[in-house]
From Swiss-Prot:
Its EC number is 2.4.1.182. GO terms for molecular function: lipid-A-disaccharide synthase activity; phospholipid binding. Residues 225-607 are annotated as: Lipid-A-disaccharide synthase. Pathway: Bacterial outer membrane biogenesis; LPS lipid A biosynthesis. It catalyses: a lipid X + a UDP-2-N,3-O-bis[(3R)-3-hydroxyacyl]-alpha-D-glucosamine = a lipid A disaccharide + UDP + H(+). This is Lipid-A-disaccharide synthase. Condensation of UDP-2,3-diacylglucosamine and 2,3-diacylglucosamine-1-phosphate to form lipid A disaccharide, a precursor of lipid A, a phosphorylated glycolipid that anchors the lipopolysaccharide to the outer membrane of the cell. SUPFAM superfamilies: UDP-Glycosyltransferase/glycogen phosphorylase. The keyword Membrane does not apply. In the C-terminal section; belongs to the LpxB family. Keywords: Glycosyltransferase, Lipid A biosynthesis, Lipid biosynthesis, Lipid metabolism, Transferase. Residues 1-224 are annotated as: Unknown. It comes from Chlamydia trachomatis serovar D (strain ATCC VR-885 / DSM 19411 / UW-3/Cx).
């Protein structure tokens, strides 16, 4: 098409094109190697498309019809990979029409050029190094065309996977066609001394070989073991996990269950790699100081999962840690089913976590009724189970002699205090609860019974009681908390799952949660967690049934809680709360699926 001097001067355009191709495949290979399976990011298509434009120009300038034609086809397929993920993807028929139109336009252009332009041919062989090579015979040109055809078929293979298998990926047949076609093309261009194409097809063999090696690893990957990894990081998660394991062992006794769990899970023939208690930290500084140990345990966990390759991974609540684990497993090529039990509080803060759930999970188990609306338009499969505490509390048989066993006085009625399970919870929340009790009119008419979630911290409870001179007080072990809820006049409870338990036990409750200054600052001004209600019963019904005192020292004082105690001591206020608690129970149990149905969905359906 152009005089020889201009053709030689523009020859580096092909090298420039190959720079884009090489960068695209380097990015693809880097991500594939990191994740352990074939990955094709969007930047791959943009870089390849840019390279294709330069290569089409190179084909016209160097009078190489097959190069211009095949890279035009590839350019359209690159475009299709980006277009199909857009809001307005074109139909397949239009893409096919575009391919035919481009093929016609390029063929006609070369036909006209070869007829009327003296320097243009259908398949020139630029010898930029001026090697003493004889002109390629018809047989060699035929070999070159066969190689180019096979090499370009790879993107038609990719297009097939894209349209009919809905996979914007580079499958093993793509790399096989690349390797075979690229090898033939390399021989041809070595024969003709075409430096650009020698570099193009020679370097192109490396990503083909590397990706085929990964594909072969995938083919011989260790099959799934008949096991299930389950992880819970908090007491509430341990309760859920214990109930889940009980149902699992009854329905699937041969499945080996291992992971992270507390006492209730460990009591269900569960192999704990780590005790749940080793992951329990709260508050900014506690989490910061515990990060090295948490990171070490996280590393051991995901490596153990990849080594064991369980059929299913079930993460219970504890979202920040579990999201990190789930992302790592997927990035390292874990193909099993991943289930998250308990939806993170995306309705309260960090709604972007919904995208993470949709991207990495196969199934999300919901326990709160209002969460169903959050995913009604989502592709993520969800199952609403209802809150398991509802059934637990409904079937609970109280110990009628619990007060005698604990040698509790019976001369006065009592108020219950549930300060929380962590050391920091006890030091902050119990102090407020005790001070409020002491400042109220109930101090002279009632005993204060403090529920202890962790016997290790009983001495802290005693210290707080003694420091505030709360003489009419006693400690009640957590195993008697439901008896305590049912027989107390009303309760003071730290915001959390315990508040839902008091509601389901029809216990009138005042909610307290005193935060440290740093936690208050982060919640208000960094994470912007400002809600009309924070305790689950209030959120479920969409109205305030339990008074809430939540925040830092400037947000409320113990005198405010004491005033609420004086109001709640009236029988009318207590009955009003109990009626609302019955509404909570009804809302939780409407349209809930059974655990047996859920387990069938997890273990008897494909991912």
């Amino acid at each position: 098409m152009f005089p020889q001097k201009i053709t030689l001067w523009l020859y580096p355009l092909g090298l420039f094109a190959n720079l884009f191709f090489g960068t695209a495949f380097c990015v693809q290979w880097s991500l594939t190697r990191k994740k352990g399976y074939s990955v094709v990011p969007k930047i791959f298509w943009y870089l390849s498309g840019t390279g294709a434009v330069f290569m089409i120009c190179h084909g016209f300038i160097q009078s190489q019809y097959p190069i211009a034609l095949l890279h035009s086809f590839n350019l359209i397929i690159y475009f299709r990979n980006l277009n199909i993920a857009s809001l307005n993807p074109l139909p397949v028929s239009k893409i096919a029409s575009l391919l035919v139109s481009v093929a016609t336009a390029i063929t006609v252009s070369f036909a006209i050029g070869t007829r009327y332009l003296p320097h243009m041919t259908w398949m020139a062989s630029p010898n930029i190094l001026h090697l003493n090579l004889p002109e390629a015979s018809l047989s060699w040109q035929l070999i070159g065309c066969i190689g180019l055809t096979i090499f370009s078929l790879r993107f038609f293979i990719q297009w097939f996977y894209l349209e009919y298998k809905n996979q914007s990926a580079l499958p093993a047949p793509f790399w096989k066609a690349s390797l075979l076609g690229g090898s033939i093309c390399l021989l041809y261009f070595l024969r003709t001394g075409d430096l650009v194409n020698v570099l193009c097809y020679g370097c192109g063999l490396f990503p083909s070989l590397a990706n085929l090696r990964i594909a072969s690893r995938e083919a011989f990957r260790k099959p799934f073991s008949n096991s299930c990894f389950i992880s819970a990081g908090e007491h509430s998660g341990d309760t859920l996990g214990g109930n889940l394991l009980k149902e699992m062992h009854a329905k699937y006794p041969d499945i080996h269950c291992f992971g992270v769990g507390g006492p209730q899970m460990r009591a269900q023939n569960f192999h704990a790699l780590f005790a749940m208690e080793k992951f329990q930290v709260s508050g900014f500084w506690e989490v910061l100081l515990a990060l090295p140990k948490l990171w070490y345990r996280y590393q051991l966990l995901y490596r153990n999962i990849l080594k064991t390759n369980p059929r299913t991974v079930i993460c219970i609540d504890f979202p920040d840690f579990h999201f990190l684990l789930i992302k790592k497993l997927r990035s390292r090529g874990y193909k099993g089913k991943i289930v998250h039990y308990v939806c993170p509080s995306i309705w309260a803060w960090r709604p972007s976590r919904k995208t993470v759930l949709e991207k990495y999970l196969d199934l999300l188990l919901l326990i709160l009724p209002f969460e169903q609306n959050l995913f009604k338009d989502s592709a993520l499969r969800t199952v609403y189970l209802g809150h398991p505490l509802s059934e637990t509390i409904k079937s609970f048989s109280p110990n009628l002699n619990w007060k005698d066993q604990l040698h509790l006085p019976t001369d006065k009625p009592f108020i219950a205090a549930f300060p929380g399970s962590r050391r920091s919870d006890i030091l902050r929340n119990l102090t407020i609860q005790v001070q409020a009790f002491q400042a109220s009119s109930l101090a002279s008419t009632h005993h204060l019974l403090v529920s202890s979630a962790n016997p290790e911290y009983d001495h802290l409870i005693l210290e707080v009681l003694q420091q505030n001179r709360c003489l009419h007080s006693h400690i009640v072990p957590s195993q008697f908390r439901y008896e305590l809820m049912r027989e107390c006049d009303f309760a003071l409870a730290k915001c959390g799952t315990i508040v839902l338990e008091t509601a389901l036990n029809l216990t009138p409750t005042i909610v307290t949660c005193q935060l440290r200054p740093l936690d208050t600052f982060l919640a208000k001004y960094i994470f912007n967690i400002i809600l009309p209600a924070y305790s689950l019963p209030n959120i479920i019904l969409g109205r305030t049934i339990f008074p809430e005192f939540i925040g830092g020292k400037k947000d409320f004082q113990y005198e405010d809680v004491a005033a609420a105690l004086n109001i709640l001591k009236t029988s009318q206020a207590q009955e009003k709360q109990k009626d609302s608690c019955r509404d909570v129970y009804q809302a939780i149990n409407e349209s809930a699926s059974s655990m047996k149905e859920c387990l069938s969905l997890i273990f008897e359906t494909a991912s």
